[in-house]
Amino acid sequence: MFMINLLLMIVPILLAVAFLTLVERKVLGYMQLRKGPNVVGPYGLLQPIADAIKLFTKEPLRPLTSSISMFIIAPILALALALTMWTPLPMPYPLINMNLGVLFMLAMSSLAVYSILWSGWASNSKYALIGALRAVAQTISYEVTLAIILLSVLLLNGSFTLPTLITTQEHMWLIIPSWPLAMMWFISTLAETNRAPFDLTEGESELVSGFNVEYAGGPFALFFLAEYANIIMMNIFTTILFLGAFHNPLMPELYTINFVTKSMLLTISFLWVRASYPRFRYDQLMHLLWKNFLPLTLALCMWHVTMPIITAGVPPLT
């Protein structure tokens, strides 16, 4: 039975990822005053299927000097971790209801760094290695603020369990009392998922394509799927943390509709940001985090520690 539940979660995620690639190309197309893909199927709707067939039927080339095992394991690990991070998300009921769901998600997102590092190192190409080092430095740096922001939100929530966030936000979204955190969280998720304007890992002008430059066909598609699954997952996480939808146990469908709408709007805002902003310089990216975000989040975390105590507000303890 559990395997059926797992499949019922994984298949829709992969479908959502496939169509997110199409939505991205369409949105970017219309923002640049062109049509986007419109040849394969009606309005280009079958484009993701054509892309998948093309990628998975290509020969998976590998460089002669690469270390084979790591080269093959890295993309599989990337996708496996991206899908694992969905398990504790309440939509409205999680696949596995964990006591420390938030901690689990932080741990999984930290492990994702290894797949990037291995892929860059195993490719044995200087471009891939530089791209991987950039990606790792960026991901690890922005995880610091993500963790502190999470801690601040959880101080209002009262536990590390994700479903209690729904109870916490029955009367008010957490974006209202902690909007500076929400803004920094959104920008940090952009950096964490390597999206524009923080897509330094795949700076075409200087690094050709970044850490996945030596990958072709199937393994490349796995990295691609992992990246987009992470984007959707991060937006869903943002919705749960800051824009909690109202959950009526008698009609869980209403929660799902509400929640999916918010997550889709956030995902489209990711694409909007990509179409609007130029790429950051690497030192600007690091300055933004270590000199702007970190002091601010630390100060706000201390404020979130004191605020419930001052107002004698007890978080929901159920």
UniProtKB/Swiss-Prot annotation:
Please list the GO terms describing molecular function. NADH dehydrogenase (ubiquinone) activity
GO CC, alphabetical:
mitochondrial inner membrane
Membrane topology listed for this record = Multi-pass membrane protein
Provide the protein name.
NADH-ubiquinone oxidoreductase chain 1
Keywords from UniProt, A to Z, are: Electron transport, Membrane, Mitochondrion, Mitochondrion inner membrane, NAD, Respiratory chain, Translocase, Transmembrane, Transmembrane helix, Transport, Ubiquinone
Q: Which domain of life is it from?
A: Eukaryota
Q: Which Pfam families match?
A: NADHdh
> Could you say which EC number(s) this protein's record lists?
7.1.1.2
InterPro entries per record: NADH_UbQ_OxRdtase_su1/FPO, NADH_UbQ_OxRdtase_su1_CS
Q: Which residues cross the membrane?
A: 2-22, 68-88, 100-120, 146-166, 171-191, 222-242, 253-273, 293-313
Annotated compartments? Mitochondrion inner membrane
Q: How does it assemble?
A: Core subunit of respiratory chain NADH dehydrogenase (Complex I) which is composed of 45 different subunits.
Task: Give the UniProt record's GO annotations in the biological process aspect.
Answer: mitochondrial electron transport, NADH to ubiquinone; mitochondrial respiratory chain complex I assembly
So what family is this one in?
Answer: Belongs to the complex I subunit 1 family.
Q: What is its main location?
A: mitochondrion
Q: What class of enzyme is it?
A: translocase
Give the reactions, separated by semicolons, that this protein catalyses. a ubiquinone + NADH + 5 H(+)(in) = a ubiquinol + NAD(+) + 4 H(+)(out)
